[in-house]
Each structure stands twice: as structure tokens, then as C-alpha cells.
């Protein structure tokens, strides 16, 4: 009988040791959060980059969709009266989002993707940021563009939302799948 009790006690002790919290501050496999990859893509280019990032990081992919989709006429940057031109000329413009708020609570790292419009993030990105509690999150911008860089857009996001943890952004124009995967995996580790 004593052997049975001793054996049960030893098994219980091993179970407790296996379940005990790691006191070295390391994350256990079950507690790591997956990144959230959110993106706005009017033409599909940024969506392709976002899918690659989500695949590379094992992240959750979600679209930032405006309530009213952009038409080709809306995106005509040569027309000062086009919807995109009017929005970008108005720093207070906040296009409404389609659907409800996203659950960002379970994610520590959030990749935020967008096309560069007028050297900035489209105003729908401001709507997303202002509609979600992103404090304490690591925000990693990525973008696509026909000719502009990402630096000014990140500078403007940092200026508009200084309380948030914005990392340096990455322009993914023409980047290979392997290059995007390598960058995304490193950025998700931050």
C-alpha cells in the first residue's frame, strides 16, 4: 500500500513540476499569441502581401474594409474631386468601416498594411486605429506603392498616435515571397 501511495505521490509531483510556470520569464508554447495581420487594399496588391505575412507568421488575417468600397473613379488620383483625393485632402476624414470591430485583445503584435496614398496611409487606416484599443500592442506597418516610400506615412502615424508602439515600416513593392516571409518572421519576434 505504501508503494502505491509513494508512486501516486511521485506521479503527482512530476505532473505539478511539468505544469509549473517557468520562472525564467520564458513564454511557454501555449501562451504565445499569434500576430494579427490587418490590411486595407483597394486593388489587391496589399492583400497579397498581407496573406504572405499571415502565412509566414501563422498570424490571423483580417481585412480593413470601408463600408463603401472604392470604385475606379474613387481612386482616380488625377481627379481632385475623386473620393480618395477628397479624403486625403481632409486630415479629419474617417471613412466608416464595414462590419464590427475586430478582436485585437489576444494579439501582441499587429501588422497593419495599406497602399501609400499621397505619401501617407489612407484615412481608413486612421478609422481602424481610432476604433480599436491598440495600447500595449506592437504595431508593424507595411505598405505597397506605385512610387512613394513608407517612411513619411509611418512618421505621420507616429505623430497622430504617439501613445502607440509603432515600429519601422516596410515597403513591400516587388519583394519576393521569401523576402517578405523573412522580414515578417523577424518583425513578429519583437
Where in the sequence are the language-model features?
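Repetitive helical segments and hydrophobic/amphipathic motifs
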Residues: 11-12
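A structural signal for short coil/turn segments at secondary-structure junctions
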Residues: 57, 132, 161-164
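Bacterial N-terminal signal peptides that target proteins for export
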Residues: 1-8
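N-terminal beta1-alpha1-beta2 submodule of the flavodoxin-like/Rossmannoid cofactor-binding fold
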Residues: 20-108, 112, 119-121, 126, ...
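C-terminal motif of bacterial Sec signal peptides marking the signal peptidase cleavage site
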Residues: 15-18
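Conserved strand-to-loop "acid loop" that flanks and positions the catalytic carboxylate
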Residues: 114-115, 144
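Short, glycine-/small-residue-rich phosphate/pyrophosphate-handling segment
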Residues: 140-176
Amino acid at each position: 500500500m505504501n508503494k502505491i501511495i509513494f508512486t501516486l505521490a511521485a506521479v503527482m509531483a512530476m505532473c505539478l513540476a511539468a505544469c509549473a510556470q517557468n520562472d525564467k520569464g520564458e513564454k511557454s508554447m501555449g501562451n504565445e499569441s499569434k500576430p494579427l495581420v490587418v490590411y486595407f487594399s483597394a486593388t489587391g496588391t496589399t492583400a497579397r502581401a498581407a496573406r504572405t505575412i499571415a502565412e509566414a507568421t501563422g498570424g490571423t488575417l483580417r481585412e480593413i474594409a470601408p463600408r463603401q468600397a472604392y470604385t475606379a473613379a474613387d481612386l482616380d488620383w488625377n481627379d481632385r474631386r475623386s473620393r480618395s483625393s477628397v479624403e486625403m485632402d481632409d486630415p479629419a476624414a474617417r471613412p466608416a468601416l464595414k462590419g464590427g470591430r475586430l478582436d485585437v485583445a489576444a494579439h501582441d503584435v499587429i501588422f497593419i498594411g495599406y497602399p501609400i496614398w499621397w505619401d501617407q496611409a489612407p484615412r481608413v487606416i486612421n478609422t481602424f486605429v481610432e476604433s480599436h484599443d491598440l495600447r500595449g500592442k506592437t504595431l508593424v506597418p507595411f505598405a505597397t506603392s506605385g512610387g512613394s516610400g513608407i517612411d513619411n506615412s509611418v512618421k505621420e502615424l507616429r505623430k497622430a498616435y504617439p501613445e502607440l508602439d509603432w515600429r519601422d515600416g516596410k515597403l513591400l513593392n516587388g519583394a519576393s515571397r521569401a523576402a517578405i516571409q523573412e522580414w515578417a518572421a523577424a518583425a513578429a519576434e519583437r
